[in-house]
Amino acid sequence: MATNLQDGNTPCLAATPSDPRPTVLVFDSGVGGLSVYNEIRQLLPNLHYIYAFDNVAFPYGEKSEEFIVERVVEIVTAVQQRYPLALAVIACNTASTVSLPALREKFAFPVVGVVPAIKPAARLTANGIVGLLATRGTVKRPYTRELIDRFANECRIEMLGSAELVELAEAKLHGEPVPLEELRRILRPWLRMQEPPDTVVLGCTHFPLLQEELQRVLPEGTRLIDSGAAIARRTAWLLEHEAPDAKSSDENKAFCMALTAETEQLLPVLHRYGFPTLEKLPL
Protein backbone atom coordinates (compact mmCIF):
# COMPACT_ATOMS: atom_id res chain seq x y z
CA MET A 1 0.00 0.00 0.00
CA ALA A 2 1.43 3.38 -0.96
CA THR A 3 2.25 5.84 1.78
CA ASN A 4 -0.10 8.79 1.89
CA LEU A 5 -0.49 12.05 3.75
CA GLN A 6 -3.80 12.78 5.44
CA ASP A 7 -5.28 15.39 7.71
CA GLY A 8 -7.29 14.42 10.75
CA ASN A 9 -10.63 14.70 8.96
CA THR A 10 -9.71 12.61 5.93
CA PRO A 11 -10.86 8.97 5.93
CA CYS A 12 -7.95 6.55 6.14
CA LEU A 13 -7.26 3.97 3.49
CA ALA A 14 -8.71 0.60 4.36
CA ALA A 15 -6.64 -1.15 6.97
CA THR A 16 -4.93 -4.39 6.07
CA PRO A 17 -6.91 -7.16 7.79
CA SER A 18 -4.97 -9.03 10.45
CA ASP A 19 -5.43 -10.68 13.80
CA PRO A 20 -5.98 -8.22 16.66
CA ARG A 21 -2.67 -7.15 18.21
CA PRO A 22 -1.87 -5.11 21.33
CA THR A 23 -1.73 -1.40 20.50
CA VAL A 24 1.46 0.36 21.60
CA LEU A 25 2.03 4.10 21.30
CA VAL A 26 5.57 5.39 20.82
CA PHE A 27 5.75 9.16 21.30
CA ASP A 28 8.51 11.72 20.83
CA SER A 29 8.73 15.43 20.14
CA GLY A 30 10.40 14.57 16.83
CA VAL A 31 11.48 11.50 14.91
CA GLY A 32 14.28 10.48 17.26
CA GLY A 33 11.86 8.11 18.95
CA LEU A 34 12.03 5.95 15.84
CA SER A 35 15.34 4.66 17.23
CA VAL A 36 13.50 3.34 20.31
CA TYR A 37 10.57 2.08 18.24
CA ASN A 38 12.98 0.14 16.04
CA GLU A 39 14.44 -1.66 19.06
CA ILE A 40 10.95 -2.54 20.31
CA ARG A 41 9.82 -3.68 16.87
CA GLN A 42 12.83 -5.98 16.51
CA LEU A 43 11.92 -7.69 19.78
CA LEU A 44 8.13 -7.49 19.35
CA PRO A 45 7.35 -7.42 15.62
CA ASN A 46 3.71 -8.48 15.90
CA LEU A 47 2.22 -5.47 17.68
CA HIS A 48 -0.04 -2.69 16.44
CA TYR A 49 2.17 0.40 16.60
CA ILE A 50 1.20 4.05 16.70
CA TYR A 51 4.01 6.57 16.32
CA ALA A 52 3.17 10.15 17.28
CA PHE A 53 5.51 13.12 17.11
CA ASP A 54 4.96 16.74 18.08
CA ASN A 55 6.41 18.65 15.17
CA VAL A 56 4.55 21.80 16.27
CA ALA A 57 6.32 22.15 19.65
CA PHE A 58 9.59 20.43 18.64
CA PRO A 59 12.16 20.54 20.18
CA TYR A 60 11.19 19.99 23.82
CA GLY A 61 14.69 20.50 25.21
CA GLU A 62 14.22 24.25 25.71
CA LYS A 63 10.55 24.17 26.80
CA SER A 64 9.32 24.63 30.38
CA GLU A 65 8.45 21.56 32.43
CA GLU A 66 4.85 22.75 32.82
CA PHE A 67 4.42 23.08 29.07
CA ILE A 68 5.90 19.64 28.39
CA VAL A 69 3.71 17.87 30.94
CA GLU A 70 0.51 19.50 29.68
CA ARG A 71 1.41 18.91 26.05
CA VAL A 72 2.38 15.24 26.41
CA VAL A 73 -0.74 14.42 28.45
CA GLU A 74 -2.89 16.14 25.81
CA ILE A 75 -1.32 14.18 22.94
CA VAL A 76 -1.44 10.78 24.66
CA THR A 77 -5.08 11.45 25.56
CA ALA A 78 -5.91 12.23 21.93
CA VAL A 79 -4.31 8.98 20.74
CA GLN A 80 -6.03 6.95 23.47
CA GLN A 81 -9.41 8.31 22.38
CA ARG A 82 -8.84 6.96 18.87
CA TYR A 83 -7.02 3.74 19.74
CA PRO A 84 -7.37 2.17 23.21
CA LEU A 85 -3.78 1.58 24.27
CA ALA A 86 -2.17 -1.44 25.87
CA LEU A 87 0.98 0.56 26.63
CA ALA A 88 2.68 3.87 25.85
CA VAL A 89 6.39 4.54 25.45
CA ILE A 90 7.52 8.13 25.94
CA ALA A 91 10.54 7.88 23.65
CA CYS A 92 11.90 11.28 24.59
CA ASN A 93 14.37 11.77 27.41
CA THR A 94 13.28 15.33 28.07
CA ALA A 95 9.58 14.44 28.25
CA SER A 96 10.25 11.32 30.31
CA THR A 97 12.12 13.20 33.02
CA VAL A 98 9.10 15.43 33.75
CA SER A 99 5.84 13.89 32.47
CA LEU A 100 5.80 10.27 33.67
CA PRO A 101 4.12 10.92 37.05
CA ALA A 102 1.24 12.83 35.43
CA LEU A 103 0.79 10.19 32.72
CA ARG A 104 0.82 7.29 35.17
CA GLU A 105 -1.71 9.06 37.37
CA LYS A 106 -4.09 9.68 34.47
CA PHE A 107 -3.93 6.41 32.53
CA ALA A 108 -4.50 2.81 33.61
CA PHE A 109 -2.18 1.31 30.98
CA PRO A 110 1.58 1.10 31.64
CA VAL A 111 3.69 4.07 30.59
CA VAL A 112 7.38 3.45 29.90
CA GLY A 113 9.87 6.29 29.96
CA VAL A 114 13.34 6.69 28.53
CA VAL A 115 16.15 7.74 30.85
CA PRO A 116 19.87 8.10 30.13
CA ALA A 117 21.68 4.75 30.32
CA ILE A 118 24.02 5.92 33.07
CA LYS A 119 23.87 2.69 35.09
CA PRO A 120 25.24 0.38 32.34
CA ALA A 121 27.76 3.02 31.29
CA ALA A 122 29.17 3.14 34.81
CA ARG A 123 29.61 -0.64 34.72
CA LEU A 124 31.32 -0.65 31.32
CA THR A 125 33.76 2.25 31.57
CA ALA A 126 37.40 1.25 31.86
CA ASN A 127 38.91 4.66 32.64
CA GLY A 128 36.11 5.78 34.97
CA ILE A 129 35.14 8.69 32.73
CA VAL A 130 31.62 8.63 31.28
CA GLY A 131 30.27 11.19 28.85
CA LEU A 132 26.60 12.13 28.91
CA LEU A 133 25.47 13.57 25.59
CA ALA A 134 21.96 14.99 25.94
CA THR A 135 19.83 18.06 25.45
CA ARG A 136 20.58 21.03 27.67
CA GLY A 137 17.29 20.43 29.49
CA THR A 138 18.19 16.84 30.36
CA VAL A 139 21.68 17.84 31.48
CA LYS A 140 20.29 20.50 33.85
CA ARG A 141 17.41 18.57 35.39
CA PRO A 142 17.71 17.27 38.97
CA TYR A 143 16.53 13.83 37.80
CA THR A 144 19.75 13.39 35.82
CA ARG A 145 21.87 14.30 38.83
CA GLU A 146 19.90 11.78 40.90
CA LEU A 147 20.69 9.05 38.35
CA ILE A 148 24.38 9.92 38.48
CA ASP A 149 24.47 9.99 42.29
CA ARG A 150 22.64 6.66 42.47
CA PHE A 151 24.42 4.66 39.77
CA ALA A 152 27.68 6.40 38.88
CA ASN A 153 28.95 8.13 42.00
CA GLU A 154 32.37 6.50 41.58
CA CYS A 155 32.73 7.74 37.99
CA ARG A 156 33.61 11.13 36.59
CA ILE A 157 30.67 12.27 34.50
CA GLU A 158 31.35 14.75 31.71
CA MET A 159 28.04 16.25 30.58
CA LEU A 160 27.55 17.92 27.22
CA GLY A 161 24.19 19.48 26.35
CA SER A 162 23.34 20.21 22.73
CA ALA A 163 20.16 21.12 20.90
CA GLU A 164 22.09 21.24 17.62
CA LEU A 165 22.60 17.47 17.59
CA VAL A 166 18.83 17.01 17.68
CA GLU A 167 18.50 19.23 14.62
CA LEU A 168 21.28 17.31 12.83
CA ALA A 169 19.53 13.99 13.51
CA GLU A 170 16.23 15.33 12.18
CA ALA A 171 18.00 16.68 9.11
CA LYS A 172 19.64 13.30 8.50
CA LEU A 173 16.24 11.60 8.42
CA HIS A 174 15.14 14.23 5.92
CA GLY A 175 17.99 13.08 3.68
CA GLU A 176 20.56 15.77 4.47
CA PRO A 177 24.22 14.86 5.06
CA VAL A 178 25.67 15.23 8.55
CA PRO A 179 28.67 17.62 8.48
CA LEU A 180 31.43 15.99 10.52
CA GLU A 181 33.11 19.34 11.14
CA GLU A 182 29.94 20.49 12.87
CA LEU A 183 30.02 17.39 15.06
CA ARG A 184 33.67 18.05 15.91
CA ARG A 185 32.78 21.60 16.92
CA ILE A 186 29.96 20.39 19.20
CA LEU A 187 32.14 17.67 20.75
CA ARG A 188 35.23 19.90 21.06
CA PRO A 189 35.14 20.00 24.91
CA TRP A 190 35.65 16.23 24.95
CA LEU A 191 38.01 16.04 21.99
CA ARG A 192 40.37 18.49 23.70
CA MET A 193 40.55 16.48 26.91
CA GLN A 194 43.81 14.70 27.69
CA GLU A 195 41.76 11.68 28.79
CA PRO A 196 38.29 11.83 27.22
CA PRO A 197 35.32 9.62 28.15
CA ASP A 198 35.75 6.03 26.98
CA THR A 199 32.00 5.45 27.30
CA VAL A 200 29.36 7.89 26.05
CA VAL A 201 25.69 7.77 26.99
CA LEU A 202 23.41 8.89 24.17
CA GLY A 203 20.95 10.68 26.43
CA CYS A 204 18.50 11.72 23.73
CA THR A 205 16.59 9.33 21.49
CA HIS A 206 17.65 11.33 18.44
CA PHE A 207 21.31 10.60 19.00
CA PRO A 208 21.39 6.88 18.02
CA LEU A 209 20.42 8.12 14.56
CA LEU A 210 23.86 9.79 14.48
CA GLN A 211 25.78 6.81 15.84
CA GLU A 212 27.82 6.22 12.69
CA GLU A 213 28.91 9.85 12.45
CA LEU A 214 29.63 10.12 16.18
CA GLN A 215 31.87 7.06 16.02
CA ARG A 216 33.85 8.66 13.20
CA VAL A 217 34.47 11.81 15.25
CA LEU A 218 35.01 10.45 18.77
CA PRO A 219 38.29 8.70 19.71
CA GLU A 220 38.62 5.16 18.41
CA GLY A 221 37.19 2.59 20.78
CA THR A 222 34.69 4.93 22.44
CA ARG A 223 31.59 2.98 23.47
CA LEU A 224 28.20 4.50 22.64
CA ILE A 225 25.33 3.38 24.85
CA ASP A 226 21.63 4.11 24.60
CA SER A 227 18.59 2.71 26.40
CA GLY A 228 16.62 1.42 23.38
CA ALA A 229 17.19 -2.31 23.96
CA ALA A 230 16.37 -1.99 27.66
CA ILE A 231 13.14 -0.17 26.84
CA ALA A 232 12.20 -2.96 24.42
CA ARG A 233 12.73 -5.60 27.11
CA ARG A 234 10.70 -3.59 29.62
CA THR A 235 7.90 -3.19 27.09
CA ALA A 236 7.80 -6.94 26.48
CA TRP A 237 7.59 -7.68 30.21
CA LEU A 238 4.82 -5.17 30.84
CA LEU A 239 2.75 -6.39 27.89
CA GLU A 240 2.94 -9.91 29.28
CA HIS A 241 2.26 -9.09 32.92
CA GLU A 242 0.46 -5.76 33.37
CA ALA A 243 -1.02 -4.34 30.16
CA PRO A 244 -4.79 -4.21 29.55
CA ASP A 245 -6.29 -6.18 26.68
CA ALA A 246 -6.36 -3.29 24.19
CA LYS A 247 -5.98 -4.68 20.67
CA SER A 248 -6.51 -3.60 17.09
CA SER A 249 -6.36 -5.25 13.68
CA ASP A 250 -5.54 -1.95 11.95
CA GLU A 251 -2.26 -1.25 10.20
CA ASN A 252 0.47 0.74 11.92
CA LYS A 253 -0.04 4.48 11.77
CA ALA A 254 1.99 7.63 12.35
CA PHE A 255 0.57 10.90 13.64
CA CYS A 256 2.03 14.39 13.56
CA MET A 257 0.56 17.59 14.99
CA ALA A 258 0.67 19.53 11.71
CA LEU A 259 1.02 18.50 8.08
CA THR A 260 3.84 20.46 6.44
CA ALA A 261 6.30 20.18 3.59
CA GLU A 262 8.80 18.77 6.08
CA THR A 263 6.45 16.01 7.24
CA GLU A 264 5.83 15.11 3.61
CA GLN A 265 9.59 14.61 3.21
CA LEU A 266 9.45 12.10 6.06
CA LEU A 267 6.99 9.81 4.30
CA PRO A 268 9.63 7.51 2.74
CA VAL A 269 11.38 7.21 6.12
CA LEU A 270 8.15 6.38 7.95
CA HIS A 271 7.30 3.85 5.28
CA ARG A 272 10.66 2.12 5.79
CA TYR A 273 9.88 1.89 9.50
CA GLY A 274 6.53 0.24 8.78
CA PHE A 275 4.11 3.19 8.87
CA PRO A 276 2.19 3.36 5.59
CA THR A 277 0.13 6.43 6.54
CA LEU A 278 0.70 9.75 8.28
CA GLU A 279 -2.16 11.82 9.70
CA LYS A 280 -2.55 15.02 11.62
CA LEU A 281 -3.72 14.20 15.14
CA PRO A 282 -6.63 16.46 16.16
CA LEU A 283 -6.11 17.83 19.67
UniProtKB/Swiss-Prot annotation:
Protein name as annotated: Glutamate racemase
High-level lineage: Bacteria, Pseudomonadati, Pseudomonadota, Gammaproteobacteria, Enterobacterales
Function: Provides the (R)-glutamate required for cell wall biosynthesis.
Coiled coil: none
GO MF, one example: glutamate racemase activity
Residues bound to substrate: 28-29, 60-61, 93-94, 205-206
EC number: 5.1.1.3
Catalytic site positions: 92 (proton donor/acceptor), 204 (proton donor/acceptor)
Family of this protein: Belongs to the aspartate/glutamate racemases family.
GO BP, sorted A to Z: cell wall organization; peptidoglycan biosynthetic process; regulation of cell shape
Catalytic activity: L-glutamate = D-glutamate
NCBIfam families: glut_race, PRK00865.1-1
Domain of life: Bacteria
Top-level EC class: isomerase
Native species: Klebsiella pneumoniae (strain 342)
Pathway: Cell wall biogenesis; peptidoglycan biosynthesis
Record key words, sorted: Cell shape, Cell wall biogenesis/degradation, Isomerase, Peptidoglycan synthesis
Pfam families: Asp_Glu_race (PF01177)
InterPro entries: Asp/Glu/hydantoin_racemase, Asp/Glu_race, Asp/Glu_racemase_AS_1, Asp/Glu_racemase_AS_2, Glu_race
PANTHER family noted in UniProt: GLUTAMATE RACEMASE (PTHR21198:SF2)
